[in-house]
């Protein structure tokens, strides 16, 4: 993908924006203080904390950059102002599947977002505030952040399509990191090297075990790449860009591996989401089929690719496509095998938008579950159909890979 393609929002992501919160019955991104027990408590706490006009607290770390007004965007850092909060857990999606939505809301809405507007090219020569934001983004451990607030606090929480939500926000006139920042040495070296491309830096850091969440954060903060190419990248774009970069890297490896010799089904459920991964004995091909129980009158969303991958953005499933594909490719590469993959993702009525991470982490959890083996595609799909709540026929009516695989079987 190129950044110019990333502002596009998938059709399923537009569906997510209509999701009604089960707590208050309103659209999640239009939360009301009068009804939300989580947010009301958070807002009351921050109102007391802001009596001095400044805030001090630990950041997981977390930085955010919006896309509105691009190429001049709002960006900043987040800190937690509630006592007893595990700052590290606030930005650790790999640990969130075991939490309830109530717990996740309580965690994420306790993050205060201090923001300022920046031209995206200012990443190349940052001023004092942006430099502090970039410094916090580099840290691999929680850091203490101090903000001086100007103007009123925006009471409405921030629910995004791909990024995890945050609590109240306000404009800051000053922001600084208190104490030392802990960053991997090689990351610091690549940040200082303005002759290495972002894709080269991402590839090397991923090979060294740096995860996609850290990579998306430093990429969003404009800390990777050649000097002339560095810019602030809206957080939701950076998440998908990193998922796509890593997926393409892994795909180049997977295409050279041996093909599996059986049909396998993996499954997992958490947080009102269920995933079923069907691996088939074929060269690489991939399809994501996503259905919403809240919108049964609408057809499932679908995107796919064949052996050489995609050359255009996945317009139906959006960022979810790249998140799920990354987890599947990572699994195949780690096992030294190649396969085709058809992934069914079902979203229950209780879900509210908490970010694209759940596609990545739930797929990863499913693939680590052991799975079941079947003798044919029809047997595998029959099992998946018995576990889905939306009729299998609705998913298959949108699938391109299932009829293709069946036609190849008949030819063989």
Mark where each language-model region is:
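Long, low-complexity intrinsically disordered regions enriched in acidic and polar residues
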Residues: 1-412
């Amino acid at each position: 993908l190129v950044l110019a393609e990333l502002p596009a929002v998938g059709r399923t992501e537009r569906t997510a924006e209509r999701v009604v919160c089960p707590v208050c019955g309103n659209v999640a991104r239009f939360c009301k203080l009068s009804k939300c027990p989580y947010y009301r408590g958070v807002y009351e706490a921050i109102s007391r904390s802001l009596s001095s006009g400044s805030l001090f607290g630990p950041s997981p770390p977390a930085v955010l950059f919006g896309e509105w007004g691009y190429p001049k965007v709002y960006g900043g850092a987040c800190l937690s102002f509630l006592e007893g909060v595990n700052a590290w857990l606030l930005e650790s999606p790999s640990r969130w599947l075991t939490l309830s939505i109530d717990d996740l809301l309580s965690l994420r809405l306790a993050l205060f977002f201090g923001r300022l507007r920046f031209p995206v090219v200012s990443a190349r020569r940052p001023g004092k505030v942006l430099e502090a934001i970039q410094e916090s983004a580099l840290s691999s451990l929680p850091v203490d952040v101090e903000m001086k607030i100007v103007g009123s606090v925006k009471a409405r929480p921030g629910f995004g399509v791909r990024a995890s939500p945050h609590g109240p926000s306000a404009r800051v006139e000053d922001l600084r990191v208190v104490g030392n920042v802990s960053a991997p040495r090689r990351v610091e070296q690549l940040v200082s090297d303005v002759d290495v491309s972002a894709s080269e830096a991402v590839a090397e850091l991923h090979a060294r075990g740096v995860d996609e969440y850290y990579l998306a954060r430093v990429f969003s903060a404009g800390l990777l790449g050649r000097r002339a190419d560095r810019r602030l990248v809206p957080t939701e774009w950076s998440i998908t860009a990193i998922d796509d970069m890593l997926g393409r890297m892994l795909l180049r490896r997977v295409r050279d591996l041996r093909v599996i010799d059986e049909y396998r089904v993996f499954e997992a459920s958490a947080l009102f989401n269920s995933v079923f991964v069907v691996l088939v004995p074929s060269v690489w091909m991939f399809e994501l089929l996503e259905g919403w129980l809240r919108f049964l009158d609408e057809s499932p969303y679908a995107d796919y690719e064949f052996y050489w991958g995609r050359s255009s953005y996945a317009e139906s499933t959006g960022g979810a496509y790249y998140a799920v594909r990354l987890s599947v490719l990572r699994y195949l590469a780690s096992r030294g095998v190649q396969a085709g993959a058809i992934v069914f993702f079902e979203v229950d009525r209780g879900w509210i938008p908490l970010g694209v991470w759940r596609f990545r982490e739930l797929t990863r959890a499913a693939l680590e579950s052991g799975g079941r083996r079947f003798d044919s595609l029809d047997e595998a799909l029959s099992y998946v159909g018995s576990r889905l709540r939306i009729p299998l026929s609705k998913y298959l009516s949108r699938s391109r890979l299932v009829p293709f695989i069946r036609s190849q079987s008949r030819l063989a």
